[in-house]
Amino acid sequence: MEIKRFGRIREVIPLPPLTEIQVESYRRALQADVPPEKRENVGIQAAFRETFPIEEEDKGKGGLVLDFLEYRLGEPPFPQDECREKDLTYQAPLYARLQLIHKDTGLIKEDEVFLGHIPLMTEDGSFIINGADRVIVSQIHRSPGVYFTPDPARPGRYIASIIPLPKRGPWIDLEVEPNGVVSMKVNKRKFPLVLLLRVLGYDQETLARELGAYGELVQGLMDESVFAMRPEEALIRLFTLLRPGDPPKRDKAVAYVYGLIADPRRYDLGEAGRYKAEEKLGIRLSGRTLARFEDGEFKDEVFLPTLRYLFALTAGVPGHEVDDIDHLGNRRIRTVGELMTDQFRVGLARLARGVRERMLMGSEDSLTPAKLVNSRPLEAAIREFFSRSQLSQFKDETNPLSSLRHKRRISALGPGGLTRERAGFDVRDVHRTHYGRICPVETPEGANIGLITSLAAYARVDELGFIRTPYRRVVGGVVTDEVVYMTATEEDRYTIAQANTPLEGNRIAAERVVARRKGEPVIVSPEEVEFMDVSPKQVFSVNTNLIPFLEHDDANRALMGSNMQTQAVPLIRAQAPVVMTGLEERVVRDSLAALYAEEDGEVAKVDGNRIVVRYEDGRLVEYPLRRFYRSNQGTALDQRPRVVVGQRVRKGDLLADGPASENGFLALGQNVLVAIMPFDGYNFEDAIVISEELLKRDFYTSIHIERYEIEARDTKLGPERITRDIPHLSEAALRDLDEEGVVRIGAEVKPGDILVGRTSFKGESEPTPEERLLRSIFGEKARDVKDTSLRVPPGEGGIVVRTVRLRRGDPGVELKPGVREVVRVYVAQKRKLQVGDKLANRHGNKGVVAKILPVEDMPHLPDGTPVDVILNPLGVPSRMNLGQILETHLGLAGYFLGQRYISPIFDGAKEPEIKELLAQAFEVYFGKRKGEGFGVDKREVEVLRRAEKLGLVTPGKPPEEQLKELFLQGKVVLYDGRTGEPIEGPIVVGQMFIMKLYHMVEDKMHARSTGPYSLITQQPLGGKAQFGGQRFGEMEVWALEAYGAAHTLQEMLTLKSDDIEGRNAAYEAIIKGEDVPEPSVPESFRVLVKELQALALDVQTLDEKDNPVDIFEGLASKR
């Protein structure tokens, strides 16, 4: 099929790798492929360097020191697929070469020590933890550094905040009090800052010289009593203020203040914080702490420059500004590598504590590095992070786009981040610095709106964690191909033009150019422009970039469209959209859903499970295909070959399509012929009418795979057994089980069918001596077993596609205590579209299938072509997502011309271009009608008369030209399939790309007759998962009361709910065919009475003569 490209803007640079934020970050943290001597001091290398050397605390023993030399990662013990099957973590063993040095003797012992396992990242940027694919979401937080913000309580006054990395030191606030004293707040304690300045060695003259320009502000520092002290005395005074309960000793005070501001192990601004502080205050720092401790004295790094800036800001000196905390220059991203390293550092600190304890306990001669180190705390910290952290999430792999989006997510929640309740509007809002860095459209709709966002398409995260976006340099009105990646702070210094600025060659064509400076729009001459956007795509995320004609959609609906694409279910017959945006191929390639040739060669063999390619150098390389693999969401991940034997392939050519891809293009739905018109009220309120033909052609059929699992345990009564030998079952019930009792692959199973046979021992009394004798003679046969087999739950079923058995003792299998074996059965279902399923397009138009019409009842074109889907026109104007109309028009042209289109966002097909294509399409459409011997039908002419009155066509023109005029508006005359008469007015018809979403009615349908009850209240449980009932709540009771339906109401509140005695009697009566007896007292009433009695309230039931009556009589015996 021919693909026609629109767009005038040249691609200057390709998109960066879409999973780079994950893959690069983790690679940098592990540095597994870098030789030890060449490793940078980042990631786990930095964590080792910070934690070691570990010195013995008891200095009297001569002193042991454990030092770190280098680390290495071993090979993972199991491949990825085996980890998924056996519930293992895909990880590599970590070894460190350590040295134990005896200080007094100079003896050195060296050892390689095993430090546990570290999970490895798969090629696509996810992890396999306990058999499940997971993604670590990047976190956005306020960058460490020095910030100046207005004091909310006092206008004209400011607070300086010094912020370290999370959990690496205290926040420190400096402010000028109403009485003029400059105070410092740390760990919720306030004291005069002058005290700390004296500790740091400043005297009156120095402060007067450094800050003399700010006259009266400096007076707040000049406390004579403080300057009269020596720095050591000021230190002890400071210590007593901060730790009032501790004895004021010099060494204690030095240790405390050192830990607070100068110890690199306990206080850390991080590289980003150091950079931000230097940039803000215009200084150079020697390290990442606030002060140094040299020769027994504290030396200042940050406090005086911060104070100088605070005074200048208060005095209104030009060039000093408050900070906007939502500016992306002040927020940074913590990617996987950093998050994991933080946990690794915590684990190492625990490990070091254990080493110090062992140094004190053991005899020095017998100690070796291996004996000192216990790797458990480190391994536990890493495992905790990957399996339980709020940022470690179950991977969304509904389709390739969802998994890609999940890896590009940015969350402000999580440890050290915000909470939903605390986050206000400002944090959630779109900020001007989001331009080209964070997508302004894609975010969830609920409580997390604005807190969870997505990285923009071209954005990259630098080493310091700031998001950079690319710009082309402009010199003297000429746009060069030099591309510069800039942070939000750097960008504020320049004048930047938009990507769609008209160019002649490389020179800016316009005399006045719309540009932006610090986020504000300005109109400038070409010579003033310093940079230019690289592409209109750079503003939005990958998902939003997949919406054609995005510029014609309201942002609220574009948000829904972006989010719903990730919920699209991969279909059996996937189709790439007729109207694409140009990113479809990149998404499939970077998500690793499809298979591509790694070198040039020729296809040697193709079958359903593998493709073999003979490379130019004669090597045969096999590419195994993933067939019907169950995703985390239960959709089928399936790869299908797209090459034939003997075909030549180049490096990077497509070998096999993955789920939701067609010839390497993302294919989340189907192109269907849509009519936008009301239809007898069936498409009221966003409901959708579809043609039965879609079901016949399997257009919206998807495969879903459910996993069922059963364990065989050792119980007190004896071991459970997986077996075919199940008591009281007919041979028919067992026909699909193999001799071991597991269902065979290929069997069709329905609700209630056995998937795995299992027997468990019944509880019984102590056997008599005779029984014991019989048992010893005849074996266990004599004991009673009950059937506890795994059966297909209600409303489910399908074809068994795979079974897995894990037995204790098999290599790599780790089962829970008491479990002997686990059997898993995978059952696949083919689901056709049905009433109640949710459909949506890319523009946020979503609805539920309300009616499936026979194809002969659908409206049809004059040539007899029936439409596939009828959408309600009222769904468009108020939602303001007109992109779908333009897509439909362009789709109409594509339908008759047999073309596909690439229409990039903000640079796509314009109205005249669409009209030109529609004119060509009309020639094909009308030419075909004429060729078949019928021109304009007289009933069509009636519709055209009506169109004239509406001003849609030029009066007096020949009907054929009027039809063409309508066609250029994307409208045609449609006929009602039921009556054969034309529909009154012209109707918009065309191809629209529509997806089936993951919310399928089959997963939500549920009915209960008899089922489980809650233990305390004895009322039926709720929810499909518990096989629960429908709650008959307070308002429903009012409804029955209003109608006076007393018997129905009584039945609802007793027999059908928690009247134990009554429901058992009713069950019996129904079986025997007798009348249902009167209900007795509900159990919840008994619970209420018992609770009141527990509160020492004597609740009694009295008859008319005031004699006590036990209304619960008989209830206790039934319990």
Swiss-Prot record:
What is catalyzed by this enzyme?
A: RNA(n) + a ribonucleoside 5'-triphosphate = RNA(n+1) + diphosphate
Show the GO cellular component annotation of the record.
Answer: DNA-directed RNA polymerase complex
Its family? Belongs to the RNA polymerase beta chain family.
* Subunit composition and interactions: The RNAP catalytic core consists of 2 alpha, 1 beta, 1 beta' and 1 omega subunit. When a sigma factor is associated with the core the holoenzyme is formed, which can initiate transcription.
Q: Which Pfam families match?
A: RNA_pol_Rpb2_1, RNA_pol_Rpb2_2, RNA_pol_Rpb2_3, RNA_pol_Rpb2_45, RNA_pol_Rpb2_6, RNA_pol_Rpb2_7
Please name the top-level EC class of this enzyme: transferase
Disulfide bonds listed in the record: none
Q: What is this protein called?
A: DNA-directed RNA polymerase subunit beta
State the EC number(s). Answer: 2.7.7.6
Annotated GO biological processes are: DNA-templated transcription
For this UniProt record, the keywords arranged alphabetically read as follows: DNA-directed RNA polymerase, Nucleotidyltransferase, Transcription, Transferase
InterPro entries (alphabetical)? DNA-dir_RNA_pol_bsu_ext_1_sf, DNA-dir_RNA_pol_bsu_external_1, DNA-dir_RNA_pol_su2, DNA-dir_RNAP_su2_dom, DNA-dir_RNAP_su2_hyb_sf, RNA_pol_bsu_bac, RNA_pol_bsu_CS, RNA_pol_bsu_protrusion
**Which organism was this protein described from?**
Thermus thermophilus (strain ATCC BAA-163 / DSM 7039 / HB27)
Highest taxon, organism lineage: Bacteria
Q: What CDD domains does the entry give?
A: RNA_pol_B_RPB2
Gene Ontology MF: a single term: DNA binding
Q: Briefly, what is this protein's role?
A: DNA-dependent RNA polymerase catalyzes the transcription of DNA into RNA using the four ribonucleoside triphosphates as substrates.
- Report whether Ligase shows up as a keyword of the record: no
